[in-house]
Amino acid sequence: PENIPLRIPDIALGAEEFIGAELYPVTASLGNLSASFDGLTLNRGRTWEHKRLSAEVRALGHFSNFFGADDLPLHYQVQCEQGLIVSGATGCLFSASEWGDDDNLIEVRHCWYISQPALRQRIIDG
C-alpha cells in the first residue's frame, strides 16, 4: 500500500532488485586484503555497498538518480575495488541514501562500479 513508509532495511530489497539476486552481509579476506560487504550475492558475482547520502555524492546525481562510477569519490572507488578483489565479483552496486527521523526514505542515489585495472593494481601493490 502507498501509505506504508519505506524502512531502512528495505533499501537492501531495492538493491536486490537492481542486482537481480539476494544479498547477504558478510566480511571476507584474501591475503592481506579484507572487505566488509553490505551485500554479496551467493555466487559472489556482485557486491553492494551502501553509504549515507552526502552532499558530495548528491551533487553527482544525474538521470533517474544514477551517476557514473568515474564520478564516485576516490575513497569510495577504492572501497568498491578492494571488495571486488576480495570477493572475485565483477561489479558493485554503490548506493547512498538519506533517511528521515521517522525512518522514511528521503532520497537515494546509485551507480554501478566496474573494476578499474589501474586502481586494482595500485591496491594490490599496496
Model-predicted segments: where are they?
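Nucleic-acid nuclease catalytic cores
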Residues: L13-G126
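Charged, glycine-rich intrinsically disordered N-terminal tails and low-complexity linkers that flank
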Residues: P1-G14
